[in-house]
Regions:
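N-terminal strand-loop-strand
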Residues: 1-31
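Generic alpha-helix detector with strongest preference for long hydrophobic helices that associate
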Residues: 2, 17, 27, 64-66, ...
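Short, charged helix-to-loop "capping" segments that act as catalytic/coupling loops
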Residues: 12-17, 56-62
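Unchanged
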Residues: 34-61, 67-116
Length: 116
């Protein structure tokens, strides 16, 4: 089975920070991402998942191609994750209950944090 996910490297341009979401279930930080729904493009899924998890509006930077990671999940599933570079455009009115706590981290400090 192939799983497709999409998300954003959500950037605050003026402060040169990137958003990370805290996941209680795993006790770690991650970039906002999730499953691509049927009939949805990778870009649409990335914007939706970012809004759901952060309550922020993501504007994809079209000049950059998405970063694509292929990996095997712990259950042995083949997963492709499409990560887009995006600018934070402010608060979203998304009412999804999947919202996580977010932190804004300077680019050079991202790898000092427990990431998955």
């Amino acid at each position: 089975m192939i799983i497709e996910k999409a998300g954003c490297f959500l950037i605050r341009k003026e402060t040169k920070e990137i958003a990370l979401v805290y996941r209680d279930k795993y006790n770690d930080y991650s970039f906002p991402k999730g499953h691509v729904e049927e009939g949805e493009s990778f870009k649409e899924a990335a914007i939706r998942e970012t809004a759901e998890e952060t309550k922020r509006i993501a504007q994809i930077i079209d000049e950059y191609k998405p970063f694509v990671e292929n990996y095997t999940t712990p259950r042995g599933e083949n997963c492709f994750c499409y990560m887009f570079f995006a600018i934070d455009k402010g608060k979203s009115d998304n009412q999804c209950e999947d919202t996580h706590d977010i932190i804004w981290t300077p680019f050079d400090k991202v790898y000092d944090i427990s990431l998955v």
